[in-house]
Curated annotation (Swiss-Prot):
Protein name: Uncharacterized protein YncE
Lineage, uppermost ranks: Bacteria, Pseudomonadati, Pseudomonadota, Gammaproteobacteria, Enterobacterales
Tagged with keyword Signal: yes
InterPro entries xref list: Haem_d1_sf, Host-pathogen_enzymatic-act, WD40/YVTN_repeat-like_dom_sf, YNCE-like_beta-prop
UniProt keyword terms in alphabetical order: Signal
Protein's organism: Salmonella typhimurium (strain LT2 / SGSC1412 / ATCC 700720)
Organism domain of life: Bacteria
SUPFAM superfamilies in the record: C-terminal (heme d1) domain of cytochrome cd1-nitrite reductase (SSF51004)
Length: 353
């Protein structure tokens, strides 16, 4: 989750019929319940490998001083840096194909994607996804979220713009297989149900879109809320067994739970304006970052109650989860602007669940 967003928290007075408004009853945990380590400037998304027993963090480094970026390999227990993989292009989004142990990083500024061998740290290849030159009239699509289908060795990448698309990349050849067009304005959210051959995306038009990965065709698109208000469904995470999608909204103080089979809203969970979301099937919980509030929420996915919050100032950004579902990782950004860069590196937090 690496684009900058403005959040406008506001309370909801009324709800759609059949949906739930869930009051937040939670406990706030102190900093001593977490391990926090400074890593590097420009921290964004993470990827976790059970096989390598490692966590990777994409960092864009300094805007002014560094042309490229660094991917850090971290010890998942101590969060100490065990390897620094320097890149001439800045990495932002991240995912891993667990079958091939290939890391994939979105190079947002350059409209490209880079593949890295998780074991060696060697760059396996790179693909420019939108080669158009940026002008006042032309805005190349920018890679945002990445998901890997281990069964087919296919990488799906959301290309964000006024008219977004999803790139479908062959993980073996690192070549573009096809492009799924017309996914709406700022189509950032991306989640995959490999067994069901379904890909889901969300956008700033307030839509939930279902795609058939066998044909790479859009099957359905549904505007989730028809309340006359602005919504930006910025990220989503799936409970594939329960046919649910947890969806964050950067324009509203609630998290939506949607039935992936029909797009119907199952619940509205009261929470601060949100950014990243990650479902944990082991604990039947969902975790959500609230950038402006400086917190991470833990949602009981059975009751839809917010049961815990972690204070994670300044700006909690992205989430990653260990394969056993017992450890949560959070990337946390310091306050930084184009005029005044942060003087301290960004952090990674390890939370024992």
């Amino acid at each position: 989750m690496h684009l900058r967003h403005l959040f406008s928290p506001r309370l909801r007075g009324s709800l759609l019929l059949g949906s739930l408004l869930v009051a937040s009853s939670f406990s706030t945990l102190a900093a001593e319940d977490m391990l926090r380590k400074a890593v590097g400037k420009g921290a964004y998304e993470m990827a976790w490998s059970q096989q390598e027993n490692a966590l990777w963090l994409a960092t864009s480094q300094s805007r002014k001083l560094d042309k490229g970026g660094v991917v850090y390999r971290l010890d998942p227990v101590t969060l100490e840096i065990t390897q620094a993989i320097h890149n001439d292009l800045k990495p932002f989004g991240a995912t891993i194909n667990a079958a091939t142990q290939t890391l994939w990083f979105g190079n947002t500024i350059n409209s490209a994607v880079t593949a890295i061998d998780a074991k060696t740290g060697d760059v396996k290849g790179r693909l420019v996804l939108d080669a158009r030159k940026r002008t006042e009239e032309v805005r190349p699509l920018q890679p945002r979220e990445l998901v890997a289908d281990a069964a087919t060795n296919t990488i799906y990448i959301s290309g964000v713009g006024k008219e977004s698309a999803i790139w479908v990349v062959d993980g073996e050849t690192i070549k573009l297989k096809t492009t799924i067009e017309n996914t709406g304005k700022m189509s950032t959210g991306l989640a995959l149900d490999s067994k069901a051959q379904r890909l889901y995306t969300t956008n700033a038009d307030g839509e939930f879109i279902t795609i058939d990965t066998a044909s790479n065709k859009i099957l359905s698109r549904k505007k989730l809320l028809d309340d006359g208000k602005e919504h930006f469904f910025i990220n989503l995470s799936l409970d594939t067994a329960g046919h649910r999608a947890f969806i964050t909204d950067s324009k509203a103080t609630e998290v939506l739970v949607v039935d992936t089979r029909n797009g119907n809203i199952l619940a509205k969970i009261a929470a601060p304006a949100s950014l990243a979301v990650l479902f944990n099937p082991t604990r039947n919980e969902a975790y959500v970052t609230h950038r402006q509030a400086g917190q991470v929420s833990v949602i009981d996915a059975k009751t839809y109650n917010v049961v815990k919050t972690f204070d994670t100032p300044t700006y909690p950004n992205s989430l990653a989860l260990s394969a056993d579902g017992k450890t949560l990782y959070v990337s946390v950004k310091q306050k930084s602007t184009r005029e005044q860069e942060a003087t301290q590196p960004d952090d990674v937090i390890r939370i024992a669940l």
